[in-house]
Design a protein with these regions (language model features):
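N-terminal targeting segments with Sec-dependent signals, encompassing both cleavable signal peptides
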Residues: 1-471
């Protein structure tokens, strides 16, 4: 039967010598050389001597490793006598003629950068003693030098994801900011007055969208009235509330929603809207107005100062151009959404992603192959829908890291919970991809202690890469 050779065994010296388990492993400042010699089939004439020198070379540099000498029977006796006379220790590794079996050869030499592209050759010399013809040869053992840099670049660390908690009741809301027009000091909705028709159509379309969707159930309707900040506050509050009530009455009459679900409130004088409008306007006095609003806390005094700017003309201009837009009613519909399975979720994520909980999105993402376009897209949608959620940000960072997009990953990681094992693992991945191996190792160790499987795998891989390997 044919002999079974060790893995990656190579034949030398006309198939009489077998080498296996060859390893060139750089670690720090050292190169570890290891291989197994099988000399069981080697025959050497009694008077002859075989010299084997593993040679590390890149064509320009040569580093010969420890020589191996195999002597024939008579030659060995002469060799030993010679050593005894000179009282010298042999520098070579002597293989006794009757022990030509299998042995492990290991050497550690200082590592130099040129060695990353070197090859290991076997220089063979069988002496011409006893009237034999001398034989010289050089054969390739390997050109595979395993450097830290090569091993690290081949490693793809695993990112960690967090499965979001189940949202038992999915509460959502839609809001429309209506700028309804009322005759001066009146609070009755006239559907054909100024721009009211368009605004009311928009409110109705919001109601239709929610009421016509069998997956949604209306739970409440909030109507909040805002006033433009001129005149007495008490009067503004009273008028705004009346106008908000007018919208409620109109909707109760025209929409199929119980009046019990409506809640009317006064949102206050719309100073925020005024600041926003001023900032985007080209009024030359806008900075003066903005400073008054920012620095004058008393309501009546603030209004008086605004009226006095530039002799009153800028204020009159604002009354005409800006203030009408500040009188608004926010109409907000609160509703709940049914739960979806993965197949439904795959459709909803494209049509109306806000109807999905983060947990449902996570299930949908993981129904696609990891790292696929659809998988990545779902996590991207999740963080857009829930921009402040820590889990959504952690998972979006994980996706970015898996694509080696470090800038995007950092942006999301800042908003994630820094105390989770998943965050620690992903910090390790970030450090690894950034070339900071020691910090990566520390982060993986931290996460692995907390039981994170991705970190345990990453740590094991990194330890294998960085550990000394001697065959």
């Amino acid at each position: 039967a044919a002999a079974i050779l060790p893995a990656h065994a190579q034949k030398f010296l006309n198939d009489e010598l077998t080498l296996s388990n060859v390893s060139l492993w750089q670690q720090g400042n050292s190169l570890y050389v290891g291989m197994t010699f099988d000399m069981s089939k080697l025959t050497i004439g009694s008077t002859r001597s075989l010299s084997l020198i593993p040679l590390l070379t890149d064509g320009q540099h040569n580093v010969p490793l420890q020589e191996i000498i195999v002597n024939g029977k008579r030659r060995e006796k002469a060799y030993i006598r010679g050593l005894a006379i000179t009282k010298q220790e042999p520098t070579a590794l002597i293989v006794p003629y009757n022990k030509r079996e299998t042995f492990n050869y290991t050497q550690i030499i200082p590592y130099k950068p040129w060695m990353s592209n070197a090859s290991l050759q076997l220089v063979e010399n069988l002496c011409g003693c006893g009237n034999y013809q001398e034989m010289n040869a050089q054969e390739l053992i390997t050109n595979d030098v395993s450097t830290e840099a090569k091993r690290l670049s081949a490693m793809s660390p695993f990112v960690a994801y967090i499965q979001p908690t189940v949202e038992v009741v999915k509460n959502r809301s839609e809001q429309y900011e209506a700028h309804l027009d009322f005759p001066v000091n009146k609070s009755v909705i006239l559907t054909d007055f100024m721009n009211n028709h368009t605004e009311l159509v928009n409110i109705h379309s919001m109601f239709d969208k929610i009421q016509n969707d069998k997956n949604l159930t209306i739970k409440g309707i909030g109507i909040e009235g805002f006033a433009s900040p001129e005149g007495p506050l008490a009067f503004n509050e009273q008028l705004s509330k009346k106008r908000a009530e007018a919208l409620k009455d109109y909707l109760v009459k025209n929409e199929k929603v119980s009046s019990k679900l409506y809640k009317v409130t006064f949102g206050g004088e719309n100073w925020d809207g005024l600041v926003k409008a001023l900032k985007s306007s080209s009024m030359k006095d806008k900075e003066t107005f903005l400073n008054i609003i920012k620095n004058t806390t008393d309501d009546a005094k603030r209004k008086q100062e605004i009226m006095r700017v530039g002799g009153g003309a800028p204020y009159r201009s604002m009354l005409k151009e800006i203030y009408p837009g500040l009188r608004k009613v926010n109409c907000k519909i609160d509703y709940t959404v049914v739960n979806f399975d993965v197949e439904q979720g795959r459709i909803i994520i494209r049509e109306n992603p806000k109807y999905l909980s983060l947990n449902e999105m996570y299930q949908v993402a993981n129904s696609y192959p990891k790292g696929s376009k659809d998988f990545v897209n779902v996590f991207d949608i999740a963080v857009r829908m829930y921009p402040t959620d820590q889990v959504a940000n952690l998972n979006a960072a994980a996706v970015a890291l898996s694509q080696k997009d470090l800038n995007t990953a950092v942006k999301y990681m800042e908003k994630a919970d820094h105390t989770t094992a998943e965050f620690m693992n992903n910090t390790g991945v970030y450090n690894f991809l950034n070339g900071d191996i020691q910090r990566a190792m520390a982060a993986f160790e931290q996460a692995a202690k907390l039981g994170n499987e991705a970190a345990q795998t990453n740590l094991k891989q990194l330890q294998q890469i960085l550990n000394v390997k001697m065959k």
